[in-house]
Amino acid sequence: MARKPGRMYKKFSGPAYTRREYMGGVPGVKVAQFDMGNLTEELPIAVTLVVNETCQIRHDALEAARISANRYLLNDVGKTNYRFKVRVYPHQVLRENKQATGAGADRVSDGMRRAFGKAVGTAARVYEGQGVFTIWVNRANFEKAKEAMRRAGHKLPTPYRVVVEKGAELVK
């Protein structure tokens, strides 16, 4: 069965659904790494992707954005000239009430009876003004870091802005 579109899980209300010890069959988190690049060197400029709306970001979207930005930085800047961090973790478990389709589905399906749903993935709850990714670079690679953030932002289900958190005086 096909995955449901991300817009179905974008908005949230009610308490978080995160207690995996009470659930069975929760899929693993797709985000492979949360820290990339040169983790030891102190770099002077920090560029952060900040969301403009409160929403949920599925782990698929986080991983797609992470891969996009990291690959761009790795190819254009080099592994030793940046540090990239994913600042949110997809704790929220997403559920789906699977519906049978096709011939005879009405005999097999329960419809909306017992419609709690099964775990199909995870998402990170982010709030307006929260940072999702941060890249630390030197002055020479500042524009490339901004471009990497732009590429990552296109993979997210919410409007975003790129903010210089540290070293703003170096890039003026």
Swiss-Prot record:
Q: Does the keyword Secreted apply?
A: no
Signal peptide start and end residues: none
| One BP annotation, GO | translation
Disulfides per UniProt = none
**CC terms in the record's Gene Ontology section:** ribonucleoprotein complex; ribosome
Is-annotated flag, keyword Ribosomal protein?
yes
Q: Which PANTHER family match?
A: 60S RIBOSOMAL PROTEIN L10 (PTHR11726)
Family recorded in the similarity comment = Belongs to the universal ribosomal protein uL16 family.
- Kindly provide the name given to this protein in its UniProt entry: Large ribosomal subunit protein uL16
The beginning of the lineage is:
Archaea, Methanobacteriati, Methanobacteriota, Stenosarchaea group, Methanomicrobia
